[in-house]
């Protein structure tokens, strides 16, 4: 056995990289290195760490390959009995119960098994490499035997009396044979032989694998020696000699099985199945179709449109090429579908299912792409299409020229309009904002506010430039540049259309907002006006009802029973009195009732006032509209001297002009303030047929303001007092139509007061209605 100082020596086992001490396991080697060499150079430690990581990766790859083998062998049996005729996907979701993780135990057993397998394989590869490292043909048998004993220690013959495999007893006829790889003893029947080509194959594959993962710092000529074969590569490195003889290496059954499994892994790594080769060809054909089909579709669309960008012959050749590729795809997919069906061991069901799915996918691909291929026109059809295309282009150019002329004309008109407005001094108003957009014209102005032509748009200029570039590229025959420019032109056109659409949408939105704002303002004005009119109507209606229909305030006069009905009716029909404010309506007596009679010499009643002399002639300027007005004008003048003096009141001039309130007509705000003063007569005579007006206002300057009554004598001003010599014959009957009309009005007022919740007014109006009905019934009885 060579010494340790020999640079060509190959040692096996778990050797320390620093002291070359042989440890028995990987864990002992790791603990030895951490304890004995923890303070040494960290570079060597980094190299060892990288070596260990590589070994773990190689070990994982090996285990993955073995797991795939076991999965393939057990898939069929699992599919046959695991489900038991029940589809687990139809099960209801179940809640998880108690969970216990066995991952730690699994990792422990798995690591031990992997370590055992990897270590055993590495040992066998290293020993096999040593046995084939010398020339066995030119070496003496004694020297070969000595080398074989030096590779692995042999077991003593006396320790094994029987064969461990078959149990036969060793004798002179049944000799003992030692395994050259593990040193165990077996008989001739249980002995296996390894040929040199197989040994060279295993060692060469291990050498290639090691050369891929070995770090540059480690080499066979290292001072401390080298470890051929490691956990990371599952092999070792050795110099392989080309053996040409038929000599073989003896080994046991266990070592032979391990080496054969290693050979199977190498073959699987280098072997490519037939289905994979066919599928790779199929994918290449599909990729070729994906490249050629869009180009052909683009050429066919251009030729069918009558364009001369592409050649008809070139498109026909491309179509034939694409069709051939489709035929090849169909043939390859059929071959994959029938692959292995005639073999004696039939393929696995999963392989058959994979083949069917590949065929189905290829069929769908061909159908999808083949249906999208457009047919090419014939030469005669292509000539006709070119003529139509030429005519269409000419019409389009004519339309474009017409549009350009129209745009130029609009620009000139706009400029002339600007010049004329500038002469008239209107340029400042034009500069305040942009010109309004007319959608019918088909253009949009810029945000600067000045009218500009469509050609001033940068996008339009760029579109025109690219159009000219396309024409030049077509003339030069640069089809690739033509396609690029056409794509750019389409993008610019889309951008221009989007810009115009956004501007139109923004303009429409602004117009809609302005219209909504105007509509809201108009609605607010209408609501305010309606609210004002309602308030005026409510106040004036309340004043009119409480002043003209309050019959309970006649009590202070205490007239005779024979004259009471006429007096009440005359007061009820006195519509010429002015309304009073609503706050004092039920408490303040009316003007006609508070004024003293002409025969009363006492002081004036509360609230009795007299207007100034200057305002009296203005009260009766217009002619009276009352058909019952008396013609005798002497009585008011005679009675004016007997009336008591009234306290003068200084009133605002605006309060002297009053228009009679009509609940069915609208009034202004100015009239509402005047209508609330009980001491101001209206400017014009009231259109009340029961009010008496004097045609000569100059004769009543000193008399109190008492409205005329059509039921009193010309010599009497007070409607509640009559002469003693006048009897019942002096009464004039009231027209029945007027009484009925007043009754209907009071009913309407009662209904409105009930709706508004004015109960005090309801009581007053109800009593007045009762008295009017009584008067009407009495008058009808007297007439009858």
UniProtKB/Swiss-Prot annotation:
A zinc finger (FYVE-type) spans 157-260. The keyword Coiled coil applies. GO terms for biological process: early endosome to Golgi transport; endosomal transport; Golgi to lysosome transport; protein transport; regulation of Golgi organization. Residues 663-673, 722-732 have a biased composition (Acidic residues). Residues 496-515 form the UIM domain. It is found in: Cell membrane; Early endosome membrane. It is linked to Kariminejad neurodevelopmental syndrome: An autosomal recessive disorder characterized by global developmental delay, progressive muscle weakness, facial dysmorphisms, ophthalmoplegia and intellectual disability. Myelofibrosis, congenital, with anemia, neutropenia, developmental delay, and ocular abnormalities: An autosomal recessive disorder characterized by neutropenia, anemia, thrombocytopenia, and myelofibrosis. Additional features include global developmental delay, osteopenia, delayed bone age, ocular abnormalities, and facial dysmorphism. This is Rabenosyn-5. The lineage of its organism: Eukaryota, Metazoa, Chordata, Craniata, Vertebrata.
């Amino acid at each position: 056995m060579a010494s340790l100082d020999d640079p060509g020596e190959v040692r096996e086992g778990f050797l320390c990289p620093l002291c070359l001490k042989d440890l028995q396991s990987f864990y002992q080697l790791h603990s030895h290195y951490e304890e004995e060499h923890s303070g040494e150079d960290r570079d060597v430690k980094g190299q060892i760490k990288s070596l260990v990581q590589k070994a773990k990766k190689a070990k994982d790859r090996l285990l993955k390959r073995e797991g795939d083998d076991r999965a393939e062998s057990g898939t069929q049996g699992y599919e046959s009995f695991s489900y038991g005729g029940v589809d687990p996907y139809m099960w209801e979701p179940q809640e998880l119960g108690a969970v216990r993780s066995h991952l730690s135990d699994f990792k422990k057993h798995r690591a031990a098994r992997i370590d055992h397998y990897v270590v055993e394989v590495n040992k066998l590869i290293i020993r096999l490499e040593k046995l084939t490292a010398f020339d066995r043909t030119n070496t003496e048998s004694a020297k070969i035997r000595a080398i074989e004993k030096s590779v692995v220690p042999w077991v003593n013959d006396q320790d094994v009396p029987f064969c461990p495999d078959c149990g036969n007893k060793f004798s002179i006829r049944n000799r003992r044979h030692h395994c050259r790889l593990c040193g165990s003893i077996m008989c001739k029947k249980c002995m296996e032989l390894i040929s040199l080509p197989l040994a060279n194959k295993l060692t060469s594959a291990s050498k290639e694998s090691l050369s891929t993962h070995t770090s540059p710092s480690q080499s066979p000529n290292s001072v401390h020696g080298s470890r051929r074969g490691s956990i990371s590569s599952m092999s070792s490195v050795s110099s392989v000699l080309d053996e040409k003889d038929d000599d073989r290496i003896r080994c046991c059954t266990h070592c032979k099985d391990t080496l054969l499994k290693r050979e199977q892994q190498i073959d699987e790594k280098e072997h490519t199945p037939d289905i994979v080769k066919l599928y790779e060809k199929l994918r290449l054909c599909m990729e070729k179709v994906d490249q050629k089909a869009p180009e052909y579709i683009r050429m066919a669309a251009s030729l069918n449109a009558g364009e001369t960008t592409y050649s008809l012959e070139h498109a026909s050749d491309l179509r034939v090429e694409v069709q051939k590729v489709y035929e090849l795809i169909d043939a390859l997919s059929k071959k994959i579908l029938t692959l292995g069906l005639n073999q004696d061991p039939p393929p696995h069901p999963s392989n058959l299912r994979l083949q069917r799915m590949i065929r189905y996918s290829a069929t769908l691909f061909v159908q999808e792409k083949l249906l999208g291929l457009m047919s090419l026109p014939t030469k005669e059809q292509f000539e006709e299409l070119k003529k139509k295309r030429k005519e269409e282009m000419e019409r389009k150019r004519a339309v474009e020229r017409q549009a350009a002329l129209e745009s130029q004309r609009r620009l000139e008109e706009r400029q002339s309009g600007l010049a004329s407005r500038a002469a008239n001094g209107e340029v400042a108003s034009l500069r305040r904002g942009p010109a309004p957009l007319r959608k019918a014209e088909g253009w949009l102005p810029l945000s600067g506010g000045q009218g500009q032509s469509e050609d001033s748009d940068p996008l339009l200029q760029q579109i025109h430039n690219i159009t000219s570039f396309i024409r030049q590229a077509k003339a030069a025959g640069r089809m690739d540049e033509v396609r690029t420019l056409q794509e750019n032109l389409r993008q610019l056109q889309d951008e221009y259309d989007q810009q115009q659409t956004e501007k139109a949408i923004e303009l429409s939105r602004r117009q809609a907002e302005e219209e909504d704002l105007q509509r809201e303002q108009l609605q607010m004005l209408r609501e305010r006006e309606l609210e004002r009119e309602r308030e005026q109507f409510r106040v004036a209606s309340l004043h009119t009802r409480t002043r003209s229909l309050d019959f309970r305030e006649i009590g202070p006069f205490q007239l005779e029973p024979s004259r009471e009905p006429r007096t009440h009716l005359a007061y009820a029909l006195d519509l010429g009195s002015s309304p009073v404010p609503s706050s004092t309506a039920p408490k303040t007596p009316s003007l006609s009732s508070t004024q003293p009679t002409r025969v009363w010499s006492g002081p004036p009643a509360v609230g009795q006032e007299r207007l100034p002399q200057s305002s009296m002639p203005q009260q009766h300027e217009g002619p009276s509209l009352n058909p019952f007005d008396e013609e005798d004008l002497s009585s008011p003048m005679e009675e004016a001297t007997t009336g008591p003096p009234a306290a003068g009141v200084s009133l605002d001039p605006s309060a002297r002009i009053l228009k009679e309130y009509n609940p069915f007509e609208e009034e202004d705000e100015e009239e509402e303030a005047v209508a609330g003063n009980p001491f101001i007569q209206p400017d014009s005579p009231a259109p009340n047929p029961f009010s008496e007006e004097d045609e000569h206002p100059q004769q009543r300057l000193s008399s109190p303001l008492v409205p005329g009554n059509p039921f009193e004598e010309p010599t009497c001003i007070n409607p509640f007092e009559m002469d003693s010599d006048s009897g019942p014959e002096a009464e004039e009957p009231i027209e029945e139509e007027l009484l009925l009309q007043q009754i209907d009005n009071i009913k309407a007022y009662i209904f409105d007061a009930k709706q508004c919740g004015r109960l005090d007014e309801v009581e007053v109006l109800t009593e007045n209605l009762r008295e009017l009905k009584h008067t009407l019934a009495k008058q009808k009885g007297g007439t009858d």
